[in-house]
């Protein structure tokens, strides 16, 4: 019989630890998060409020320089609520052509009959002349209800929009009386890249969404922040979409 080979294949347990680079959505909660979740004061967010959820909403709103916040299960829902709160059937949302809200989400178009108008851009930044041309006035059959921007920009390889671009988009929209929504799922990445506070980016939008379960490594959740009347409207819409949660403070605590 042939002699057995002396070579062996190393056991998987002996291999060097691997790092999962597929997405920042695979991040795991820290031990401090687990501990805070275990100790979180809780209530019923659908009845008279959950204290940990209320604390998170206020903390994020203050961090972004906004009046109020709303905790929701995902940033997709936060973006959807921003769209629904801003407009209605047969109105238009204008956004960059490769934006996550346009390429992946598009929930408002399905649920409300709103139209998403893409504008060509470079590295996630809309061409400003094309943006201006895309805006439709009130009374038009496709009146523009909202302009949306995204930073950092997922489909542009994580590109961070310059502050002067955000300021220019805001100025164009304001001249037409149109609110701006910032899809800030990765806003804190942009904040770190630009070396500015999150509020210095959020100030160029009426409403802002931030995700807790990506780079921040919380297990679930997002916050929509903006003016009090808009967030009150979004809270009602959240219930209609089935997004109201009960002892949500267990999850919200990880974001604190």
PLM region descriptions:
Residues 2-256:
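Conserved PLP-enzyme active-site core in the AAT-like
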């Amino acid at each position: 019989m042939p002699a057995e080979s002396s070579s062996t294949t190393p056991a998987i347990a002996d291999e060097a630890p691997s790092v999962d680079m597929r997405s920042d959505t695979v991040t795991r909660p820290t031990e401090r998060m687990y501990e805070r979740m275990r100790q979180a004061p809780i209530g019923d967010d659908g009845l008279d409020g959950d204290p940990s959820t209320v604390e998170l909403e206020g903390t994020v709103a203050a961090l972004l320089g906004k009046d109020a916040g709303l905790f929701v299960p995902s940033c997709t829902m936060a973006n959807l609520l921003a769209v629904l709160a801003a407009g209605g059937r047969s109105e238009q949302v204008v956004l960059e052509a490769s934006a996550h809200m346009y390429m992946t989400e598009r929930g408002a178009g399905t649920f409300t009959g709103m139209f998403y108008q893409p504008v060509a851009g470079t590295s996630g930044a809309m061409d400003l002349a094309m943006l201006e041309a895309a805006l439709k006035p009130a009374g038009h059959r496709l009146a523009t209800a909202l302009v949306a921007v995204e930073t950092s920009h997922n489909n542009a390889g994580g590109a961070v929009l310059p502050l002067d671009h955000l300021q220019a988009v805001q100025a164009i929209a304001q001249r037409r009386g149109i609110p701006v929504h910032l899809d800030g799922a990765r806003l804190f990445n942009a904040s770190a890249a630009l070396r500015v506070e999150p509020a210095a980016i959020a100030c160029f939008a009426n409403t802002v969404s931030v995700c807790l379960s990506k780079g921040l490594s919380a297990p679930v959740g997002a916050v929509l922040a903006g003016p009090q009347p808009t967030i009150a409207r979004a809270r009602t819409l959240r219930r209609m979409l089935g997004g109201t949660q009960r002892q949500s403070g267990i999850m919200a605590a990880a974001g604190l």
